[in-house]
Amino acid sequence: MPDDRLAFCFGIHNHQPIGNFDHVLVEATERAYRPFLERLHARSEIRLVVHCTGSLLEWLRERAPGTFDLLVALAGRGQVELLTGGFYEPILAVLPDHDKFGQIERLTAFLKTHVGIRPRGMWLAERVWEPHLPRVLAEAGVEYVLVDDRHFALAGLDPEALGGYYLTEDQGTRLRVFPISQRLRYLIPFAEVEASLEYLATRRGKVPAVTMVDDGEKFGVWPGTHAHVYEKGWLDRFFDRLLATEWLDLATLSDVVDRVEATAPVYLPTASYREMGEWALPLAAQRRLERAKHDLERLGGGDADADLLRGGFWRTFLVKYPEVADTYWKMLRLSGAVRGALARAPHDGRLTEAQVALWRGQANDAYWHGVFGGCYLPHLRRAVKSALLECERRLVESGALPTPAWTREDGNGDGREEVYVRTRELTLTLNPALGGAITELGYLGRDLDVGDVLARRPEIYHAEVRAGSRRDGRAGVKTIHDAPAPKEAGLEALLAYDEVRRGSLLDGWFDAGTTPLDPVSPWERALLALPGEPLGCTTRAVGGAIAVTFTRGAEAPVSVEKAVTIREATVEVRYRLTAPAATPVAGRWAVQWNLALTAGDAPGRYLTATGRPSLGSTGRERDAAGVALVDEWIGVRARLAWAPAAELAWGPVQTVSVSEAGFERIYQGTAVLVVWPVGLRAGETRELVASITLERL
């Protein structure tokens, strides 16, 4: 390529999370994917790169065939280079190698079958890079991959001097790596067209190629972008300006690889894009990073110095959010089970279906949290959890996993043992270190984790909520990096945080007063809170059921034996409360269930209490003996019963999180609190019983 010319590798990455609402995909197609491809089709001279995740391609082929056929036509005439990747957009670095291969091969095979091409390059989900990837990707047939120029900056290179592609390796197996320009990521499509061309002109004669591939949703889905990009003509002007620039070659990545030598070798550290590194940090570290950036700016440090403030590591999300860690480790356990079962019975269709369900459960969106909602969005968590439960159910149906069965092991990497129980109807996790709490209550009859309630935690952006942050009045289209606005007033009142992780069979001893306990947050008033106490634990199989008994050694204020029995679709708990030998006691014993169905305030989601209140309501009843949480939409009833009769209270668990649309409240689940008055003579024992049964409607 002549020195006075510059190749510009422009492209888009289109993705919708597994489990996203159908109307969201329809809107994204109509507002971004289809109009972008239509304008591209009208200008045959424009050549660029497109990556669509496999699940989105499947949806387009079935639900928007015109858009799918348009993409196929563009690829067929060589105008678009399609990239492979993990079919369900997983974070490849954290998957077992056999799943890395399987995910890539599935998307590559789809493109071969339905488009007629074999992709050479790959899109790396969230650009999460780890140094072991070159060998695995190359062995999967990948010739080149894209990451951010941020990765290169962390290796000590100047982002403003980057161009072309670079060579890296692992164990001698090489891979080409293209740096994505952050400068162009922030300019396109938000700034005027000329700003991007001016920047490209500064790179002319210095590097052979510059690359900018970013989210296709920027071109019509993000707030304000549809009008800006299409109705006001930004994309037409951009394409016209690119074609009118004589020194600019519109190239695909394969064009550059075939025509240009590698720029240099490079070894990249663990990294993702800049924002991801910031989001992954624990809260205190996020605040320190913010101060460091401000201090550097005040001292006159430029972007080059700021590039070395690296932020965190993607895997830190697995520590930051224990619920995410549990999902990740469950995925790993199931991956091993699927692989072993397929090795024994490679032609069993049930196992093939289990493998596909496993891969769906590896979709990245519910495993982290940033400006796009992530793990705070229950429908995304539910989709991933449901896929993993489907995988587990199919393994059970094939006979690859026995039932009833239990194991006791450190199954989530936290150094403490959990008890994992499986029947033909349920799969659940009990935590001796959390007072015997249930943190997974998977109902295999509907592939639904009824216990999937995310705890309320402080996030760095909550300070903006308290300050009443609003979008400023500057003209122009805002990027996701601008301060978001609240979607409703009064969100600051919801900024309460949980001292203990959300779960079920959270229990404790309270005073004998008459002041009602808060069903959502009772624990600060507890005289004894079992979720804060590790308990002794024994487990055994008993006549087709699994019995797990937790004991507390201390006698004050009461000694506790908590016997949990799991049989088919029912979990029963029996409490034996004993007063100290020489001291009578009086108080209240309470047990909390945190349960997640599909919505808090939607038709067909309610409690069977008086008046059938919604799952998102708050209420209280005295002398109740049971209640059911009903979700007619998904077809599940969670039936609670207890004896003797007790006070029942309930309320919604709501978080405040941020998405590209602004700050918003999100219903995570319903907290149900059952409270018994208990008076014991010295040395007396009393037994209380409660149960939950999950049923199909």
Cite the ranges covered by each PLM segment.
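Acidic (Asp/Glu-rich), glycine- and aromatic
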Residues: 433-447, 452-459, 553-560, 566-610, ...
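Active-site and substrate-binding clefts of carbohydrate-active enzymes
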Residues: 2-34, 41-43, 162-167, 171-175, ...
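Short, well-ordered beta-strand segments enriched in hydrophobic/aromatic residues
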Residues: 421, 425, 571-579, 683
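CE4/NodB-like, metal-dependent polysaccharide N-deacetylase domain
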Residues: 99-126, 201-214
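Beta-strand-rich recognition/accessory modules
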Residues: 403, 410, 526-561, 567-574, ...
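Short, well-structured secondary-structure segments
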Residues: 5-103, 118-124, 143-149, 252
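Active-site/ligand-binding surface loops and adjacent short beta/alpha elements
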Residues: 584-588, 594-652, 659, 669
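Acidic-aromatic substrate-binding/catalytic surfaces of carbohydrate-active enzymes
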Residues: 27-30, 98, 102, 424-536
